[in-house]
């Protein structure tokens, strides 16, 4: 008779430590079916904290009511992670009171329903999804494939076209390096734009060192590319066009469908970095002729450390993998997948599709209120196209105020002056430079990010706080004093000393 793994472990332990096997047997807990108390809280899909209400207290009460209806207690809901939704008012951290969070382009808070989905994969369902000889592997592999289907459904793709990665940076590198390397004997030219994310720009520059030529398209003062310039840049040896769908600093939405049509007509692969667009704007890879698309989980209220790349199968896109190994993910991305992250990513994608209309209406309403309030102050400018912009990303320049000074003055609000990936640099935004903004305006820009869990009272507070502190900082500025006196600063010949 075959012994179970647990029984064999008990026998070995009793022999090594000379302790009766019955002692270990009495303490044995079936790990496979163990579930911690917090993991047992199941939040109803309809729990949408700020989608249907603007007051966090009311939203918490709504969550508690739903938990009570499902047989749990309000305390259990709080323990399961609903306190994460009151992120603006948490105390007892190493940095004092938690500020209001309006930096959604950097990352989004994990939805409690996503966390709830992930927990069981840290306890009972811990099998390797690539182990196909026993139920531990079958269980997690089923969950992985279900998640893959949810990720694909959001963009009308085939699940087999979704390759899981560690995030959008890896996905972008796979494309910018993998496609040109595969076609390097006949195709030596890449086209991208000057306002792409740093990982795309750096990957393109890396390919220049390998002998490829890269054309960086300009954008107009609204942040949009010129389609005629794109067509003129295409050469017989062009292998790839990469254009970001939604810009991470100014939220501008590029004409993806038109770009896809141009690329398909010229038989060139079209890649779009959709880290800021996936689940937030309508994307159909077939309708838009997209061949490759990068996705990030933590931008859609999912876990960090997981992302995906869409790779078209018909017509088939070929690329060299960055990683060598066991040939997982159809040979394009070797390495053992993390089922908790993949499952969380899939649940986040499912919720984004399910709540798409409600989320968009909520974010648009708060964005309109924020923009109206911020632009009511004099000498403020909305950066990027007002007509082709994702509402959840608002980038405003406050003339005669240093952006870093304003950020420090707004310590009770979590904001940024540009991409989180380059926030350590004090250089003005290269994206705003590409729009033709001078150093002064580029330095004075602040990015506001609105998301699913943002509230109307937070927006009201932010508008008032920003207006008050901009006024205070301007009163300290000699340049502002000169402007108030009617002096044209552009007419002054500044000394170089």
From Swiss-Prot:
EC number: 2.8.1.7
Modified residues (N6-(pyridoxal phosphate)lysine): 299
Gene Ontology BP term (one): intracellular iron ion homeostasis
Keyword Zinc-finger: no
Annotated catalysed reactions: (sulfur carrier)-H + L-cysteine = (sulfur carrier)-SH + L-alanine
Gene Ontology molecular function: any one: cysteine desulfurase activity
Function per UniProt: Catalyzes the removal of elemental sulfur from cysteine to produce alanine. It supplies the inorganic sulfur for iron-sulfur (Fe-S) clusters. Plays a role in both tRNA-processing and mitochondrial metabolism. Involved in the 2-thio-modification of both 5-carboxymethylaminomethyl-2-thiouridine in mitochondrial tRNAs and 5-methoxycarbonylmethyl-2-thiouridine (mcm5s2U) in cytoplasmic tRNAs.
PROSITE patterns membership: AA_TRANSFER_CLASS_5
Organism from which the protein derives: Saccharomyces cerevisiae (strain ATCC 204508 / S288c)
GO cellular component, one term: mitochondrion
NCBIfam families, A to Z: IscS, PRK02948.1, PRK14012.1
Listed PANTHER family: CYSTEINE DESULFURASE, CYSTEINE DESULFURYLASE FAMILY MEMBER
Binding, pyridoxal 5'-phosphate: 168-169, 248, 276, 296-298, 336
Protein name: Cysteine desulfurase, mitochondrial
Other facts noted in the record for this chain: Present with 504 molecules/cell in log phase SD medium.
